[in-house]
Swiss-Prot record:
This is Uncharacterized protein MJ0282. Gene3D superfamilies: Electron Transport, Fmn-binding Protein, Chain A. SUPFAM superfamilies: FMN-binding split barrel (SSF50475). It comes from Methanocaldococcus jannaschii (strain ATCC 43067 / DSM 2661 / JAL-1 / JCM 10045 / NBRC 100440). InterPro entries: Pyridox_Oxase_N, Split_barrel_FMN-bd. The lineage of its organism: Archaea, Methanobacteriati, Methanobacteriota, Methanomada group, Methanococci. Pfam families: PNPOx_N.
Length: 149
């Protein structure tokens, strides 16, 4: 099985700060997806782990994904933001891959167990964050903070 975070060699411009990691792992995160026809969907997620802050790799356990998963399989481009935009005003954009077995599923199981021991993930969505934008209101709203080439 190919490991997503091993696909991206070299230095990543998109690095997650300690504050970003804490926010992503401890807040409700909204994931935006779109079907191949461009029909949008937004869903709230809770079972999240940052796998590699230096390379911008994030895992989300698939516990109840329906439209979100269908969209990711059709169109892997996603956007994330936390419910706490006041303190952590960032939008993260990236590319997602889905795993139903292997190392990532095991990590998703650990994430679920820490949240709610009776949860059992169906799979794991692994996202390589490629862009980070400022969401704080003011003159820099929407400004690109970091982007991988």
């Amino acid at each position: 099985m190919k490991m997503f975070h091993k696909i991206y060699f070299g230095d990543s411009v998109v690095k997650l700060t300690e504050e970003m990691v804490k926010s992503l792992e401890n807040e409700i995160v909204f994931i935006a997806t779109a079907s191949k026809d461009g029909v949008p969907n937004v869903a709230a997620m809770r079972a999240i782990k940052v796998l590699d802050a230096e390379k911008g790799i994030v895992l989300i356990a698939d516990n109840f994904m329906n439209k979100t998963l269908k969209n990711i399989l059709e169109n892997p481009k996603v956007a994330l933001t936390t419910a706490n935009c006041k303190d952590m005003p960032y939008q993260y954009k990236g590319t997602a891959e889905y795993y139903k077995e292997g190392e990532y599923l095991k990590i998703a199981e650990e994430v679920d167990k820490a949240l709610k021991p009776d949860l059992k993930p169906k799979g794991a969505v692994v996202i390589k964050i490629t862009e980070i934008y400022n969401l704080k209101s003011g003159p820099d709203a929407g400004k690109l903070i970091a982007k991988d080439e």
